[in-house]
Amino acid sequence: MDAPIKFFATAPKGVEPLLADELRALGALEVSETRAGASFQGSLETAYRICLWSRLASRVLMPIAEFSAEDPDQLYAAVGAVPWEEHMTAAGTLAVDAQLRRSKINHSRFAALRVKDAVVDRFRERFDQRPSIDLERPDIRLNLHIDRDQATLSLDLSGDSLHRRGYRAEGVLAPLKENLAAAILLRAGWPDVGARGGALVDPMCGSGTLVIEAALITADCAPGLTRPYWGFAGWLQHRAEVWDTLLEEARQRREAGLQQLPCMIGYDRDRKAIRAARENARLAGLDAHLRFERCELEDLQAVPDAGESGGLLVTNPPYGERLGEVDELRSLYASLGEKLRTHFSGWQAAVFTGNPELAKHIGIRAHKLYKLYNGALECRLLNFDIAEQRFFGADAPQAPLSEGAIMFANRLRKNIKQLRRWLKKEDVTCYRLYDADMPEYAVAVDIYEDRVHVQEYQAPASVDSRQAERRLREVMRVLPEVLQVEPEAITLKVRRKQKGSSQYQKLDRSGERFEVREGNCWFLVNLTDYLDTGLFLDHRPTRFMLQAMAEGKSFLNLFAYTGTATVHAVKGGAATTVTVDMSRTYLDWAQANLRLNQLSGPQHRFVCADVLQYLEREQAHYDLIFLDPPTFSTSKSMETTLDIQRDHVDIIRLAANLLTPGGVLIFSNNFRKFRMDFESLPELEIENITAATIPHDFARNPKIHNCWRITRR
């Protein structure tokens, strides 16, 4: 059996989790999600199948060589050492794409030119003949990716972006790429709706991309079946017999699938758009199965052929760029909402928009919100259940807010105003807005970009539980209005004092991890599955301090949690890192965070171990150590319990023993009554740096943590 080959699939930003699931379903192994794509392993047949069947990938890349490329000459030499005669003939054609990040070579076209020169010169020197350049349909297309002067040179098996299915009529512009349209449909739940015979309607279909992609999904049609060109067709190692077998299988599945398509209709007010949609459907071989008709939104009616299965209304309405356009579009979104309420009761709906404010005029509460990107534009997909209880104004009249709730709302507004300038100046997107500022409303409100995390502090026994519940209901009523978010964007959790293993207590496995940014780092957070989210907001300055200290250093991260400090250290130029935690769940999360930032490598190790046992046996020394233990901990994996006040002398001494000469230990914990035992650590220089590590959004709570800079005397 052949050894698995490494590949990388690119995808639109925001689609990565869906892509990873799709790759696994298509037989890929060792799938690892990163920003704008996913790496995986498999056979060449697996890669062919993904090229043919992936609805979400943009390109499928097969790395040929990895090397350092600190200057153009080093790049040229490394590319020239690749045996290109194994991949193409001297009479063949090639093209080169290049993407550079944090590279000393700072011009992508120049880098691509040096790759081309190296390939061509190798053929000229060895065969006295050189390949020619074909930018449109070369025999092989190469992809050069350089990050931090480390280069990966890959064969682009797709040849052209996979969103080009081959059915878009020439000269027809589309606001959505086909793979983004497929992602919208998957997030909207169309596969389940279509499988049960539900109808699909797009009332503003444009050139028909959403309707056609929906038909390809439900009819089990391989999206690549109509493509005229592939990047592996002229590759010398192409296995034509494997590809032909996959094509034949796809044709048979398509023929069977087309027999069971439900009612699928696209409407648009523009006659040119309808003509384009019909032509696209013809090129996709679906014209006999889809309907495209001219219809104003105001004239939209119920679909008579929908049957009892209901269906999905999905659309990408215009969202305007100029002020006048936005004003006009408010009535369009309101009209869409009126049609949904009047004619599509019992259906599901999905609206993809680059202006979420306009979507509020639909007048129906979304039950799911997803962040996707249309090119560089951040957009939202809002999913709706068309049911009366979801309509704005359908709830029973609410009693006026109590005086306390009004004061809570005003405090939120005051905090927003006070933080606004600081947030902009420091480029902070995840922060604490409120932390029991009013003791009666004992919650912490954290903002994670466009989502809200609310933690209710457990009320003392002296507080009437019914009063506490009433105030919590008021909190949840006030937040959407003040923060201008949908209720579904708010996650509520009860926070209790940690006991034993509760710091790793799992809650509801309903949540998904999503990306947030912290300066130049990206992290995955999860607001529902655990008591904590994966990102301790109060340690933001500490992480940036570690990043500033890390260049060229060996870094050890102890009690590492999700590895956010490791990501900062690597971003700061740490030469090597070791990340230690006793939870496999959090170590896997830490590795995912490093991959998300495209920083993975053999120089960055992850160790699942009891930290105390690890410190006792570790022999290596480190220039920079971050030690952030819990206040109290015990688990089946630990031989003893950890009490930070009782045990801090021993654990600090063990960690400090691993410092190199001149090395620095940053020690932190969250025990509010912590007292450093200086007398028991005379060999160490210990400086309290807590004040410098408390961020502005936690200034009201300066005891949220304590932090110490420790060196050997």
Swiss-Prot record:
Subcellular location, principal:
cytoplasm
Annotated SUPFAM superfamilies: S-adenosyl-L-methionine-dependent methyltransferases (SSF53335)
Family matches, as PANTHER family: RIBOSOMAL RNA LARGE SUBUNIT METHYLTRANSFERASE K/L, RIBOSOMAL RNA LARGE SUBUNIT METHYLTRANSFERASE K_L
Q: Name one GO molecular function term.
A: 23S rRNA (guanine(2445)-N(2))-methyltransferase activity
Q: What EC number(s) would the UniProt record show?
A: 2.1.1.173, 2.1.1.264
| Protein localization | Cytoplasm
* Cited Pfam families: Methyltrans_SAM (PF10672), RlmL_1st (PF22020), THUMP (PF02926), UPF0020 (PF01170)
User: Which chemical reaction does it catalyze?
Assistant: guanosine(2445) in 23S rRNA + S-adenosyl-L-methionine = N(2)-methylguanosine(2445) in 23S rRNA + S-adenosyl-L-homocysteine + H(+); guanosine(2069) in 23S rRNA + S-adenosyl-L-methionine = N(2)-methylguanosine(2069) in 23S rRNA + S-adenosyl-L-homocysteine + H(+)
Return the protein name: Ribosomal RNA large subunit methyltransferase K/L
Per the record, what is one GO cellular component?
cytoplasm
Q: Which PROSITE patterns match?
A: THUMP, UPF0020
Give the record's keywords alphabetically: Cytoplasm, Methyltransferase, RNA-binding, rRNA processing, S-adenosyl-L-methionine, Transferase
Q: Which organism is it from?
A: Syntrophotalea carbinolica (strain DSM 2380 / NBRC 103641 / GraBd1) (Pelobacter carbinolicus)
Lineage runs:
Bacteria, Pseudomonadati, Thermodesulfobacteriota, Desulfuromonadia, Desulfuromonadales
Family stated for the protein in its record: Belongs to the methyltransferase superfamily. RlmKL family.
Say which enzyme class the record assigns: transferase
For the THUMP domain, which residue ranges apply? 46-157
Q: What does this protein do?
A: Specifically methylates the guanine in position 2445 (m2G2445) and the guanine in position 2069 (m7G2069) of 23S rRNA.
